[in-house]
Amino acid sequence: MKKYFATVFARSQIRRADRFIAHPVETQQKLLSRFLAAAADTAFGREHGFGDIRTYQQYRQRVPLCTYEDLRGYIQRIAEGERDVLWPGRPAYFAKTSGTTSGTKYIPLTREGLACQVRATRDML
């Protein structure tokens, strides 16, 4: 019985991966659009015009590459309890890095992000 369900699950994962492989650009565009729409009403999203971005090229023009230091102020606001700063709502947790390059860093982790990491780990198995 377990083998049957494992086989059904594996086949569904393979079909899903095949769709991504067959249409990588379209898949990435859909994901970018979904993320931009979700974060459009956050402080970071409003400052960078997420609501008006329709293409990857527009995203590259409006959202500069940033380091942790560039985001530190946003992360501080989140740590102080402000909602909707980098992502809607508040994070479930803060991960603490070892700080090998420039001291300890705190990374906000959302429930959605944690669920995505769990799914990715499960899918790899």
Predicted segments, located by residue:
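Nucleotide 5′-phosphate-binding alpha/beta core
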Residues: 1-96, 102-125
